[in-house]
A protein has these predicted regions:
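Regulatory modules associated with amino-acid/nitrogen control
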Residues: 1-175
Length: 175
């Protein structure tokens, strides 16, 4: 039987820290099921989902404790289960680009949740356009739409919503 452990930490951005956390699975004989490394400012955010036998996961937990003490960092970890597939949903990729505005991420997420979509992943950023210097907002999202929903209605309402904020958006089923 497989066991699962999710970890989350925020450390100094360095190749050594990336190597250290990447090496954990090998040392404990676990598999990496999901992996997210992201540089935020001068820091590195790490989220990993490991799977393994009960003794491999126990070894991982011990190594994480040791790593916390040696490197004086905080690592959140929790045993978890893999969620069941949402068979009654259609996965969609959503990409949005436009001028940055206050509360934009919240407004987009709130709109989609109000439409009964299930948000599975969100990544957004703001950067200065090299062409004009304006701050541009980008968002990538994976959402699941219940299969009994009217896709055309959701798409039309989403397009109207994005038009209100002068955002360019693409919403398409994942293959």
């Amino acid at each position: 039987m497989q066991n699962y452990l999710v970890i989350n930490t925020f450390v100094e951005n360095s190749n050594e820290n990336i190597r250290k956390f990447s090496k954990l699975a090998k040392l404990c004989r676990c598999s990496v099921i999901d992996c997210n490394f992201k540089v935020i400012g001068q820091s590195l955010s790490i989220i990993l989902l490991f799977s393994g036998t009960w003794d491999a996961i126990a070894k991982m937990e011990d190594m994480l404790e040791k790593l916390e003490k040696e490197d004086d960092i905080v690592i959140q970890s929790k045993r978890t289960e893999i969620g069941k597939l949402q068979e009654n949903c259609i996965p969609y990729a959503i990409d949005i680009v436009g001028p940055d505005q206050e509360n934009l991420t919240f407004n987009i997420i709130n709109f989609l949740l109000d439409g009964d979509l299930f948000i599975k992943r969100v990544s957004s950023s703001v950067s200065e356009s090299s062409q004009t210097g304006i701050k541009m907002f980008t968002l990538h999202m994976i959402a699941h739409i219940p299969s009994n929903s009217s896709i055309s209605t959701i798409r039309n309402e989403f397009t109207e919503f994005c038009d209100q904020f002068n955002l360019d958006a693409i919403m398409e089923p994942m293959k």
